[in-house]
């Protein structure tokens, strides 16, 4: 789904991670929930958040982040809602 102020995406990962220099720096805020699997998100300030199915996180616009890892044993399914104010 996509409108001028909101975009919803389902993302499927299986053992992927962002490249070492691959920081996301988005114009939109992002709310993401893990529906299945596991993942670790890393932030430019050095903080890491481990996520399991049912966990969610809000990422403000321009908060540089990356996917450190996703589960290699099980498919990881994300539901991401990107939005602008």
Put a short name on every predicted segment.
Residues 1-23, 81:
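A short glycine-rich, His/Asp/Glu-containing loop-to-beta-strand
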Residues 4, 47, 63-64:
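A generic "binding-loop/recognition-motif" signal
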Residues 8-10, 31, 56-58, 80-81:
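Conserved hydrophobic/aromatic beta-strand scaffold that supports enzyme active sites
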Residues 16, 53-54, 60-62:
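Tight coil/turn sites that cap or link beta-strands
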Residues 24-26, 31-53:
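A short beta-strand-loop-beta hairpin characteristic of the jelly-roll/cupin
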Residues 35, 45, 61, 72-73:
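Short loop/turn positions at the edges of beta-strands in beta-sheet-rich folds
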Residues 62-85:
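Ligand-binding loop in jelly-roll beta-barrel domains
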């Amino acid at each position: 789904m996509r409108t001028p102020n909101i975009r919803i995406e389902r993302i499927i990962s299986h053992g992927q991670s962002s490249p070492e220099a691959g920081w996301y720096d988005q114009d939109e805020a992002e709310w993401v929930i893990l529906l299945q699997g596991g993942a670790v998100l890393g932030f430019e300030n050095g903080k890491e958040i481990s996520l399991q199915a049912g966990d969610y996180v809000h990422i403000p616009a321009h908060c540089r982040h990356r996917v450190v890892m996703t589960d290699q044993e099980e498919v990881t399914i994300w539901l991401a809602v990107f939005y602008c104010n």
